[in-house]
Amino acid sequence: MKRIKLLEVRSELGAGTRGAGMGIDALRVACLNKGSDYFRRFNSVVVPDLNHVLFDKTPLFPFAKHIDAIYTVQKGIASAVEQTLRFGEFPLVLAGDHSSANATIAGIKAAYPQKTLGVIWIDAHADIHSPYTTPSGNVHGMPLAAALGLDNLAQQRNHPDAETEFFWRRLQNLAEPGPKLHPEHLVYVVVRDTEEEEEAIIAELGIKWIKLPEIKQKGSRQLTREIYEHLRFCDLVYISFDVDSLDSVFSLGTGTPVEDGLYLSEAENLCQDLLENDRVVCFEMVEINPTLDNGNTMAKNAFNILEKATEAIERRLRHGDVVSR
């Protein structure tokens, strides 16, 4: 890969709280206030959003709110990720809500259809609900179920209508048909706010789950080695970082802050160490919501992590690490 390209996704259709669509601009403000040239150094692409549909008085699809518009947005994200990779560039995705991750995964698989993908999910939430199990109807809680091709009908609580099911199948088959990811190639890091339906499917599938005490005990270097040993049969790796993985002391400016998360230094070190691996082909940061914040603190903290993560990616690219199709 030759260089980093920023993909800016301002869609917040999958979130339950408004404001994540402004997260990228909050990052830009944090960058300016720090005196950084970060957003001048990299080419960027803005993926179209459909946030205007949020003004509709009666949202359709109660078990997957705005899923029709989300499908349209995700087609654009997947295409942008695929094209970036095919041009030999590293897609660094800055997104509003976490539903975008399904499209990011689909775009990677479209660019590398013969490669096995591993996913490192750094988040407070498991995001493995489906329209059949969701307690909220918010699609940002569903990206991994879509990527894994799961419905989790054994834990069904809802009965979506035919149109919801139609668009859900479209998300599951985005870019190319079938699951993009196998459960054994998914690693949860610091996930700590889950529902019973999610816990049941995680246990059934045996998904690797690294919790906070293990992180504090082992440190980022050892954890990184163990994560990549677990993903040893994966040709490519995608790292998704939700800012609510941070402890709520540092992450008030996000829709769903959760206590007992990562400290800032832990997040910086973990992202840097994970991104040094030459199989990583994409990094994503999501869920910054300045409308819930005080003094843009969340974006300032996230921007510091983003800078450290980007430095690790650039070090790799200077050494010419390339994944061939």
Each language-model region and where it sits:
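Conserved alpha-helical scaffold segments that buttress catalytic/binding sites
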Residues: 2-325
